[in-house]
Amino acid sequence: ISRNRRNALQFRDDDHWPKRWAEAYVAFAAGEKRDWLRAMGHRIFPVVGWAERGGYDAMGHGNSVPRSHVTWGTGPGIVEPFERRAREAQKIGRLTFRFRHRVDALVMTNGRIEGVTGAVLEPDTIERGKSSSRKVVGDFTLRAPAVIVASGGIGGNHDLVRQNWPKRLGEPPKHMISGVPEHVDGRMIGITEAAGARLINRDRMWHYVEGIRNWNPIWPRHGIRILPGPSSMWFDATGKRLPAPLFPGSDT
C-alpha cells in the first residue's frame, strides 16, 4: 500500500472490521493474488495507470506511485472467471441461484439471524440493466446457519445519496447521474439495520466527477465515466492546457 494511501485511509474509532479487512486484503494483494487470478485466465492491460494520485505532486492523500490496473475485457473480463467458477459450483450442487427473488426481511429466531424472507417477482426478459417488472407472483423463505448480506451500494438511489451526503461537503449536487442501474438502491441496508445490524460510515461515499450523460441510456439517469489514459494532456475550449491540479482522472 502506498505511503499516502496509508495516510488517506483515516480509520475511525469504530472501524475495527474495516481495518481488519484492509490488512487482510493488503496481505493477499502482496502475496498470492496475482498468481491466483492469472491461473483463472485473468489478464491486465500492460500499462499501469496513476489514478487518485493525491494532487499533482503526489504528496497529498492518494497514491504516491502508479498502481491502477485495467483488466483485459474491463468489467466482463474480471467477472468471467468468477462466473465460470460459480456455474461449476452450481453443477455439483454447492451453489443455488435464486433469480427474481426480492428479500424483504431477515428472519430472526431467539436473537439470531437464520434466514431471509421476501417476494418472488414475475419473470422478465428485459435488457440487462433496464428497470424490470416489480410484480409479485409469490413469496419465499430461505434458512441457513449463516447469513451474509452483500447487496451493493446506494448509487442508483439519489434520494439516499443526498440523505447520507457528508455535512462537511455542504449541499449535495442538484443534478446527478448514475453509473449503476436503478436496482442498486441501498434497500437492503435499511432492512439489515432493522434486523439489528450496526451501520458505520454512512457518510463515506465515493462518487466520481468525470462523468457524462449516456447519449443512449439503459437505466434512469445513466452516466458514463470518462477513463483517460495515463498522464494524458487536457485542454480547455480555447486550446489552452489545463493548469495543475485540474487533471481529470488523476486525483478523484
Each PLM stretch: what is its role?
Residues A22-F140, A144, H158-V161, I212-R213:
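Conserved redox-cofactor binding core of oxidoreductases
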Residues I1-V26, M40:
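Glycine-rich active-site loop/strand segments that organize a redox cofactor
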Residues I189-I191, A195-T252:
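An anion/pyrophosphate-binding glycine-rich loop and adjacent beta-alpha core
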Residues E23, S68-G73, H175-E182, R221, ...:
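Hydrophobic alpha-helical scaffolding
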Residues P123-N216:
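Glycine-rich loop(s) and the adjacent beta-strand/alpha-helix scaffold that form part
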Residues I1, R34, G239:
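Polyanionic/metal-chelating signatures
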Residues R100-R102, A119-L121, A144-A146, A150-G153, ...:
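Fold-independent oxyanion-binding glycine-rich loops
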